A protein has these predicted regions:
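Single-stranded nucleic acid-binding surfaces, predominantly the OB-fold ssDNA-binding core
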Residues: 1-81
Length: 81
């Protein structure tokens, strides 16, 4: 896995759900538009997913530190800009 540092805007509603029979308890997913106009999918799990669902909304500008896994970025840390 590769580490990534991303800056951009949340462009979709944040989808939140619970996971059964997994090492993770909850998951948040949204699409993210980078400064250079590329769109990527972002996943977050557990406490980070709870934070994202409760504090962030569509249109927020954020900075993401995460890991690239296939075509998706898994969030390690996130900060509102």
């Amino acid at each position: 896995m590769n580490e990534v540092f991303l800056m951009g805007k949340i462009i979709t509603c944040i989808k939140f759900g619970f996971i059964i029979n997994s090492k993770h308890f909850s998951k948040a997913t949204f699409n993210f538009k980078l400064v250079d106009e590329q769109v990527i999918q972002i996943n977050a799990y557990d406490k980070i997913a709870d934070y994202i669902y409760s504090k962030l909304k569509q249109g927020d500008n954020v900075f993401i530190y995460g890991k690239l896994c296939k075509n998706v970025v898994n969030v390690i840390k996130i900060k509102i800009l």
